[in-house]
Amino acid sequence: MSEEPVDVLIIGAGASGAALAWSLAETRMNILCLEQGDWVKSDDYPSNATDWELRRLGDFGFSPNDRKLASDYPVNDSESPIAASMFNGVGGSTILFAAHFPRLHPSDFRVRALDRVASDWPLDYRSLAPWYDLNERMTGVSGLEGDPAYPQDPPKRPPLPPLPLGQLGETLARGFNKLGWHWW
């Protein structure tokens, strides 16, 4: 282990820690991320295989209470309305993340004006669009060009290609295609 001093120490290289490290990477600062758990090879990510739906029930399940890996510790969330979704390793819970970051639709910012409910946002979609773009580049969002869930003007291809559909997803896609329904 190096004993060289560091300028920035980041505890946890999950979504927040990795975003901070990414934003500082082009500086001349010496950055160190400490993480509980091991490296997971990208080839081992469950989202890279068609059996990912089954793998989510085992070593890549959301709850450390179910996984019980050596790096896991029990979490008591019985009194919480929020169930734990945690993973200990470089990347943290982003290891469980399938690069799905749906954008709000432009009309979501104008619910009062359009639907007479709640309040309109103090900003609009176009104000957030550059930040959506940055997040998608940084986190490696995948998808299909033209997906209406990701409104972009002009339309752009997501930074990464779509993840493979699981066996259930392929079955549903075939059924939707047979019916002429839009499935993505």
Give residue spans per PLM region:
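N-terminal glycine-rich phosphate/pyrophosphate-binding loop and immediately adjacent elements
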Residues: 1-113, 117, 122-126, 130-134
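Conserved redox-cofactor binding core of oxidoreductases
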Residues: 72-74, 100-103, 112-184
